[in-house]
Regions:
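Transition segment at domain starts
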Residues: 25-38
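Structural microenvironment flanking redox-active thiols in thiol-disulfide oxidoreductases
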Residues: 84-93
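Gly/Gly-Pro-rich "capping" loops immediately C-terminal to redox-active cysteine motifs
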Residues: 68-85, 122
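N-terminal targeting signals for export/organelle localization
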Residues: 1-28, 129
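Structural micro-motif
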Residues: 94-107
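Local sequence-structure signature of Cys/Sec-based thiol-disulfide redox active-site neighborhoods
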Residues: 35-76
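Non-catalytic, surface beta->alpha helical segment in thiol-disulfide oxidoreductase systems
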Residues: 106-129
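Structural recognition of the beta-strand scaffold that forms the well-ordered cores
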Residues: 52-55, 78-80, 104-106, 111-113
Length: 129
């Protein structure tokens, strides 16, 4: 257990040595792409169905995932911020859920690690537009 927990704790504190152009100086992810009607509908569906994205504001893959949705749709998602130094950090929840990397999606109680296309998310959750 200690062998798994230590790398996670190091990973969660890594942003103190990183500077990222996709985050602001307040520890928040900054999404710049525009959303489509479909991505907004999907984001609302995911939120309404309890889907959660575990993320870290300094994580490049998290930004890539968020940019697929666009800034308007991103605001609709249930996002748990795992970085210890972030605004609204929920690090303990991430540890309790055994989040091993970012982004991680929780869909129907199952954790899925990695960037997922909107099509993949639709298929995994039963979303039909």
């Amino acid at each position: 257990m200690k062998r798994l927990l230590f790398p996670l704790l190091v990973f969660l504190t890594l942003p103190s040595v990183l500077h990222s152009s996709h985050s602001n100086n307040q520890g928040e992810l900054v999404v710049t792409s525009e959303s489509t009607r479909e991505s907004i509908e999907l984001a609302k569906y995911l939120k309404d169905n309890g889907v959660v994205k575990y993320s870290a504001y300094w994580c490049p893959n998290c930004l890539n995932q968020s940019e697929l949705f666009g800034k308007q749709a991103y605001r609709e998602l249930n996002v748990v911020e795992c970085a210890r130094d972030a605004i609204n950090s929920q690090t303990q929840l991430c540890i309790d859920k055994k989040i091993k990397g970012f982004p991680t999606w929780e869909i129907n109680g199952k954790l899925i690690l990695g960037v997922l296309s909107l099509k993949e998310l639709s298929k995994l959750t039963g979303f039909k537009n």
